[in-house]
Curated annotation (Swiss-Prot):
Protein name, UniProt field: Mitochondrial import receptor subunit TOM70
Keywords per UniProt: Acetylation, Isopeptide bond, Membrane, Methylation, Mitochondrion, Mitochondrion outer membrane, Phosphoprotein, Repeat, TPR repeat, Transmembrane, Transmembrane helix, Ubl conjugation
GO cellular component terms, A-Z: mitochondrial outer membrane; mitochondrion
Keyword Repeat: yes
Post-translational modification N6-acetyllysine, affected residues: K188
Transmembrane segments: 42-62
Keyword Transmembrane helix recorded: yes
Placement of TPR repeats on the sequence: 117-150, 156-189, 297-330, 332-365, 370-403, 404-437, 445-478, 479-512, 514-547, 548-581
Length: 611
């Protein structure tokens, strides 16, 4: 089974199975309750305080979108303060009247210091509304000087109002300074915290900005879209910034054998992944069961193929390099195989020149060139270059129209681009060429299901569910079919049956760690059984200690439990296993969100609800 992270099947078009991380090709499975195939994955990062979307981890954005759905177009009644821009200062423009208060127009001796401070503030508010910000600043400064030092709340308001005026003049340093004064006086002052967050953004103080906006999100109960959007923005920037530096110096890491086998299982028309032919092996050791056969020719490529059959993957790149350096008989095959393993270890920059060369070799087998185009196209999609990706897939279809892999992988690309009808047409083309290719049939059914589910079309949903039943009956050895069916069953709240489907996956592929993660998440959503869920995710790590999905999921759950230190440790482990800069940026955003929550808890004692 080409099991992947809990993302929609579409996401697999841009990732190797089980990773979501920049390996070309791949036929990944969606996990339970995902919804992330249509959502940017870094939205998972701000998991602070929002409800846990069990089975997906995308707590933050789910919380936001759920409120949108509940609003049902009710406008301001939605509960999301979309237009709450916090531009105006606080307090009324005219002074409040009451016992012992005059109209605030003069310096009456009968007025207390606080009264005079309020009068100065109100005068400043009038100037502010008139766009006379320098005069407003003078009035707010007067209010600050007049206000008794023990009047913390009033004094904090004056500082915040002056910060608002400085903001209009784009004096960001002064904005941050005044907001800091306001927060020191009133630590849970949302308006001052948010204004300081915006100032930090302008000053390029991303870490400080994130801490402030995190506090705001918690204090507002995730009800203000403006603050959530700022948090999302800064998390993306921080993630990309951190990943860019880290990725340069990362150590390439070969994934697990199960991961590699799952990856190659998504190709059926691929020369380099086919078993060695009789003529490529000698007969010397054919009677020795369990021992590798000697390669007949002195060929680096054929030795690499032998190592593939032995699952001795670490030696493949070096053997391919020998074939290429010698310009041997299998140079084109060696270039493609080396590029594929560069992709698998997360070295896309090293893979691209090899893929380019294979594509340009007009004399090379068309199957090799088409396969190289598929992998380069998928790599482009992972690098957020959909136009280049589409061009490569279309070229592959043009030069090798009978290649089922082209349509299978292009179908996944189309799903990622939200072109479901075109995706289904591609899956149909693949199935016509390879009627027994279960993976394509399962993914077509899942595409139809997601389309019906999103459109809330119950009759089509039921038709898709029936289609899954037919697929697992027709292809009982296809773990992918069970996994995708489990996703659909989870959506339909049929948890018991979904659990049975994951058990089928485990029976078929006991070494596939991602299935244990999916099953663990299901226990949380179904039975709220945290211990069982964590036990299964821990089992996944035991089976495959290179399963970054397991570490990421464990970290996300620990965030919800309030165990920030452990969560950060899990995210860091996942970061070290990431195979693309984009995947690494996403994981850094998770880690940064956890760090920010830790700091907010220390500074302000703010802790969102935990599991």
């Amino acid at each position: 089974m080409a099991a992947s992270k809990p993302i929609e099947a579409a996401m697999a078009a841009a990732a190797a199975p089980g990773s979501g991380n920049g390996v070309g090709g791949g036929g990944g499975t969606a996990g339970p309750g995902s919804g992330a195939g249509t959502l940017p994955r870094w939205h998972v990062a701000l998991a602070i305080g929002a409800p846990l979307l069990l089975g997906a981890g995308a707590m933050y954005l789910w919380s936001r979108r759920r409120r949108r759905r509940e609003a049902g177009g009710r406008g301001d009644a939605s509960g999301l303060k979309r237009n709450s821009e916090r531009k105006t200062p606080e307090g009324r423009a005219s002074p409040a009247l009451g016992s012992g208060h005059h109209d605030g127009s003069g310096d009456s001796l009968e007025m207390s210091s606080l009264d005079r401070a309020q009068a100065a503030k109100n005068k400043g508010n009038k100037y502010f509304k008139a766009g006379k910000y320098e005069q407003a600043i003078q009035c707010y400064t007067e209010a600050i000087s007049l206000c008794p030092t023990e009047k913390n709340v009033d004094l904090s308001t004056f500082y915040q109002n002056r910060a608002a005026a400085f903001e209009q003049l784009q004096k960001w340093k002064e904005v941050a300074q005044d907001c800091t004064k306001a927060v020191e006086l009133n630590p849970k002052y949302v308006k001052a915290l948010f204004r300081r967050a915006k100032a930090h953004e302008k000053l390029d103080n991303k870490k400080e900005c994130l801490e402030d906006v995190t506090a705001v999100c918690i204090l507002e109960g995730f009800q203000n879209e403006q603050s959530m959007l700022l948090a999302d923005k800064v998390l993306k920037l921080l993630g990309k910034e951190n990943a860019k530096e880290k990725y340069k110096n990362r150590e390439p890491l070969m994934p697990s054998p199960q991961f590699i086998k799952s990856y190659f299982s998504s190709f059926t028309d691929d020369i380099i992944s086919q078993p060695m032919l009789k003529g490529e092996k000698s007969d010397e050791d054919k009677d020795k069961e369990g021992e590798a056969l000697e390669v007949k020719e002195n060929s680096g490529y054929l030795k690499a193929k032998q190592y593939m059959e032995e699952e001795n993957y670490d030696k493949i790149i070096s053997e391919c390099s020998k074939e290429i350096d010698a310009q041997g008989k299998y140079m084109a095959e060696a270039l493609l195989l080396r590029a594929t393993f560069y992709l698998l270890i997360g070295s896309a920059n090293a893979a691209k020149p090899d893929l380019d060369k294979v594509i340009s070799l007009k004399e090379a087998n068309v199957k090799l060139r088409a396969n190289a185009l598929i992998k380069r196209g998928t790599m482009c999609m992972q690098q957020q270059q959909p136009m280049l990706s589409t061009q490569d897939f279309n070229m592959a279809a043009e030069i090798d129209p009978m290649n089922s892999d082209v349509y299978h992988h292009r179908g996944q690309l189309k799903i990622l681009l939200d072109l479901v009808e075109e995706a289904v047409a591609d899956f149909d083309a693949c199935i016509r060429l390879r009627p027994k290719f279960a993976l394509a049939q399962a993914q077509k059914c899942f595409a139809l299901y997601r389309q019906a589910y999103t459109a809330n079309n119950s009759s089509q949903v039921q038709a898709a569910m029936k289609g899954f039943e037919e697929i697992i009956k027709k292809f009982p050895r296809c773990a992918e079919g069970y996994a995708l069916y489990a996703q659909a069953l989870t959506d339909q709240q049929q948890f018991g049956k979904a659990d049975e489907m994951y058990d089928k996956c485990i029976d078929l592929e006991p070494d596939n760690a991602t299935t244990y993660v999916h099953k663990g998440l299901l226990q949380l959503q179904w039975k709220q059984d945290l211990d069982k869920g964590l036990e299964l995710i821990s089992k996944a790590i035991e089976i495959d200690n290179k399963c970054d999905f397991a570490y990421e999921t464990m970290g996300t759950i620990e965030v919800q439990r309030g165990n920030m230190e452990k969560a950060i440790d899990m995210f860091n482990k996942a970061i070290n296993l990431a195979k693309s800069e984009m995947e690494m940026a996403h994981l850094y955003s998770l880690c940064d969100a956890a760090h920010a929550q830790t700091e907010v808890a220390k500074k302000y004692g703010l802790k969102p609800p935990t599991l």
